[in-house]
A protein has these predicted regions:
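Hydrophobic faces of well-ordered beta-strands that scaffold small-molecule active sites
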Residues: 3-5, 39-41, 71-73, 101-105, ...
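Internal, glycine-rich beta/alpha segment that forms the wall or movable "lid"
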Residues: 82-198, 214-218, 225-227
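Conserved, mostly hydrophobic/aromatic
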Residues: 3, 62, 93, 135, ...
Length: 376
């Protein structure tokens, strides 16, 4: 199992903006130094807490400072931009990263972003599909372009000057294009079936209960099989809220106590989900009333904390429940205590992951030996 990083992010709204951006930058650079395989950041234009306004721009700002880690948009909210702008920016970014880009896409989940871009009352899922189809068509064909849709048109036919390069759009370095990644939130996601059928790879959100995260694998398998694509659990990424600290009392206090950035994170999410009728994500029983949801219960279910050994055991228990997956995405939270936050990432890479992978190897050997014995 690989370890990666994913942040929306969510910071206190009274935190200095420059400081929060620098902390997010340092988290990505630390992830690279620690050997994390990949890292993603979200984008939200109208949220003072979720305050990275362009995931592509943020990634571009750290491209030359990273060496090995793959960087991903997490995600580009497709209905909020013109497909030609997205195609050009992502193509350039892939070259800036020398092919280390993962292209994360979604319809966007922040209602105020949809409103500010004039999409609140439109079919954003339909816009999402049209936008990504146009982006891929731009990368597939040569100029001049004349791509027509319901929401956008892309054309350079009237102004094409091929001999001097005018009217020609850039293509990504990776061929035919960077891996396309989609975030998955809904249980039993039909959207994931369609995404998998197109060869896109899923990230299961860290704010999903294990009961619902495990429903994503069958949807992914169904989509792959419908298109005759190879089914590989290495392509499934699962995000989790994790805090590692060798002082167990301190671990619990930072994860669940007063002033915890983890509790703040889930308070923000719960408030939004309740407002927009999506609080079912936090319910084991879908018949449960919204008024019965308790922040404390949600945090206890979704935040993994403790010593390196304890966290490794909890992650293995989680894996046993949801099934095998290729990459565990360590969810980035506000660095309320910079030293504790950094140390947690270090322990995750240096202590937790080796124990997890040693355990997985032993289980695989045991399974292989058992199969050999059965076959004799």
């Amino acid at each position: 199992m690989d370890v990666g990083f994913f942040t929306m992010p969510i910071h206190p709204i009274d935190k200095d903006y420059k400081k929060s951006l620098l902390e997010d930058r340092h988290a990505f650079l630390l992830a690279d130094r620690l050997g994390f395989s990949e890292a993603y950041c979200g984008e939200h234009v109208t949220d003072a807490a979720e305050n990275i306004t362009s995931s592509a721009l943020f990634i571009a700002s750290i491209a030359s400072c990273t060496k090995n880690i793959r960087l991903g948009t997490g995600t580009v909210n497709m209905p909020n931009s013109h497909p030609a702008a997205i195609a050009g920016q992502i193509a350039m970014l892939d070259h800036m990263l020398d092919g280390r880009l993962n292209f994360g896409i979604s319809p966007g989940g922040l209602a105020s972003d949809a409103e500010v871009f004039g999409n609140l009352d439109k079919n954003r899922n339909e816009m999402f599909v049209e936008c990504i189809d146009m982006v891929l068509e731009i990368w597939k064909r040569d100029a001049p372009y004349n791509i027509k849709g319901k929401y956008w048109n892309v054309s350079t036919e009237r102004t094409q000057m091929t001999e001097i390069g005018q009217g020609i759009m850039q293509k990504p370095l990776q061929k035919p294009y960077p891996p396309i990644i989609c975030t998955v939130v809904a249980p039993f996601s039909k959207g994931l079936v369609a995404a998998a059928a197109r060869g896109w790879q899923p990230i299961s959100a860290n704010f999903l209960l294990p009961k619902w995260a495990k429903t994503h694998w069958p949807s992914y398998v169904q989509g792959c099989e419908e298109s005759g694509l190879e089914v590989d659990s290495k392509n499934w990424r699962v995000a989790k809220s994790i805090f590692v600290c060798e002082d167990r009392n301190k671990a619990k206090e930072y994860a669940l106590g007063n002033g915890s950035p983890y509790v703040f994170y889930y308070k923000q999410l719960l408030t939004k989900m309740l407002k927009h009728g999506r609080a079912n994500l936090f319910k084991e029983d879908q018949n449960m009333a919204d008024s019965d949801l308790k922040l404390e219960d949600i945090c206890n279910k979704l935040i993994l904390y403790g010593s390196a050994d304890e966290v490794a055991d909890k992650i293995l228990e989680f894996r046993e429940e949801v099934g095998d997956f290729g990459t565990l995405l360590y969810a980035g939270h506000d660095w309320a205590d910079v030293d504790l936050a950094k140390k947690s990432m270090e322990l995750m890479a240096e202590k937790v992951m080796p124990k997890i992978n040693d355990n997985i190897k032993i289980c695989l050997l045991y399974t292989s030996d058992a199969a050999d014995e059965t076959g004799r």
